[in-house]
Every structure is written in C-alpha cells, then in structure tokens.
Amino acid sequence: MKPSTSTRARVRAAFVLCLLLLSSVSRAAAQQAAQQAATLPVEKVKQIEALVGAEMAKQKIPGMTVAVVSERRVRWAAGFGMQDIENNVAAKPATVYRLGSIAKPITAVAAMQLFERGKLDLDAPVQKYCPAFPEKQWPVTTRQVLGHLAGIRHYKSDDEFNSTRFYASVAEGLNMFKDDPLLSEPGTKYNYTTHGYSVLGCVVEGASGQKFADFVNENVFRPAAMERIRVDSVADIIPNRAQGYRVTDKGVLTNSPLADNSYKVPGGGFVSTAEDLARFAVALQTDRLLKRETLELMYAPQKTKDGKETSYGLGWGVAKRPTGERTVGHSGGQQRVSTFLHMQPDQGLAVVIMSNLEGARLGALAQQIGDIVLK
C-alpha cells in the first residue's frame, strides 16, 4: 500500500525538522568550541586578575580595562574597578577611553599604507603633501617625522597641552606650532613630538586626497574591525565613556580638567576600547593592514645621522627584552587616561591596558601580563 500524500509530506517535514535541529546543535557546538578556544585558561586569568588588582591598589587607579591577544587572536578582555566613581559605573570591556599617543601608530600605519600604494614618498619634503606646514631652515621629510627626528617641537607649556579650544581640521591644528623654528637639524637628534604627528596627519590628507579621519576610518578601522574607535569630542555624547582622574601632590583623587584634543587628532585625539586596540594588533599581526616587509620597516629602530640607534621606529617604540624577544608598542598619557599597547609580534602576543588615571605607569604591568599569557 502506497503512503498517502499527506503521510509523505509529514515524513518530509519531520526529516527537514530533524536536519534543522542537527544543524542547530552543530552550530551551537561549533560556537561553544570557538568561544572556548578564544579564551585564556582559567588559571592564567586568575593570575592576571590578581596582578592587575595589586597594581591598581598600589597606584590608586580607579578603573582599568585589559585586553589580551594570544596566537594572533583576541583571547580575553575584562574591566576592573570603576569607569565613573561619582555615578558608580563599573569598568568593562566596552568602556571607552582616550587613546593618548597610541594614536601615533595608527597614523603611522595610515602613512605607510600610502607608501605601499606609491602615493607617498617618505624622503620627499613634507610640503609636497602638506603645504600648510611652512618650509624651515632645513628640509623635513615624512620619514623623519615618523621617527621623531624632524626637529619639530613638542608642547611648549601646560596651557598648550591643556588647550580647551576647538580646532576644526588637522590643518587648523598646525597653527599652534607651524611658525616656530625647528629645534635641531632633522636627522641629528631624537625629539619626541606630538605636533610632528599633526604634520603627518596633514601629509596623509595630501597624499590620499581625503580628510584624515575619513582615510583612517576606511583603511585602518574598518579592515581591522575596530567598532568603537572615533575622533574624540568633548561635546558629543559618547556611550560608556570613562570619567578621568588625577592624584594631587597631596595624594587626593580629583576629576581631570577639561581638555580639547582637536588640535592633535593624528597624535593623540581618538577614543576607543581596549578590545578595539586588540583588534588593531591582530590586524597588524595577520598582515591585514600592511605587508610584512612594511611592518618590518616600521619596527626597525631609526638612526640619527651619526649612526646611533634610537628606541623608536616608524610610529612605534621598539626594544628587545633581556630574554631576546623584540617588543613593539606605545604608551599614551593625557587628561583622563594612561594607556599602553604592548606587542611581541614574533610570538603573536599583544596586551592592551587602558586606565582612567593620569600618570599611571603601565608598561611593566603589560609585560608581566604578557609573560603570564606566554607561559
């Protein structure tokens, strides 16, 4: 006896339902396995938590977020303490902090992308791309700006550093320093300079034909899957933004003063999360933003004209640990925050620390966390 049409339909429906259930279970199992693979072992997490807690207590840091990259994947992120004491808001992976000078490697990556594409000559005078920066007593090149060898000055005073004025563009921000003479002949001395990176941002605009923020959004942030990063603004409502603090000479914790970073977006004017910066590290280590040979060029210590190595590459602080591993990274410090991005590219490691205390010392902590991860 042949099964009826309705019976065959019920059998087919049951079969399809079974397949859907099996597929759902398989996807869930795969997702669970992926989540487990993307996390650190519990014992390492406990060690990191204890280390972070002790350091926060020692330095009186109100809030902190840490993210870890291992085997070139984001493995773990967590918040500690308070992102906002007055409103009793705990720090978390989604807490948004100012980056400080970690903006510099981002801008350097943008410049080196243009170099790879043949749009930027690192050894041409910067005025070829940034005519808004006047010619000086000596020629200045983009390579020298990248390595802090251009002789462009840093902050002149606390009033300048604590500026509350809004600057509408990268070129307008140059007005703060562009007419000042160079501190030294380019190539002869290492002079760390945030203002120099404003010139670099102007170079990126000239070489790309785009506004600086648009270029980094399209060419750095999107390919790296950085979802929360944006140009800082004291006026905009930015969800999950951390309040910032400082400790006075008498040891009293106070709110940070207002400061507008619009004059230095390329060198210190972004906000984001620790997870975003971890994704930036992953994108670099997996060659999604630049070719490997370009990264090696950036990670090589620059030299002054007399042949002496500096501790800075093209946009990155570079060093070797006593055990021989090379490290690449950058610190950040400004009103409201202290930050650190530590990478050991040969080991596929990165540690990001973002805190809401000015003047916090985070470099040693980042290395110690990295040592725990690599054990």
PLM features: residue spans?
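Short, conserved catalytic-motif segment at the N-terminal edge
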Residues: 40-97, 119-124, 178-179, 253-254
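Bacterial N-terminal signal peptides
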Residues: 13-24
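Short active-site loop at a secondary-structure junction
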Residues: 57-67, 86-144, 184-195, 265-268, ...
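Bacterial N-terminal signal peptides that target proteins for export
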Residues: 2-15
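Short, surface-exposed loop or secondary-structure junction motifs
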Residues: 80-84, 137-334, 339
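Boundary at the C-terminal end of the N-terminal hydrophobic targeting segment
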Residues: 28-30
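Short, gly/Ser/Thr-rich active-site loops of penicillin-recognizing serine hydrolases
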Residues: 357-375
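Short, well-ordered beta-strand elements
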Residues: 329-330, 339-357
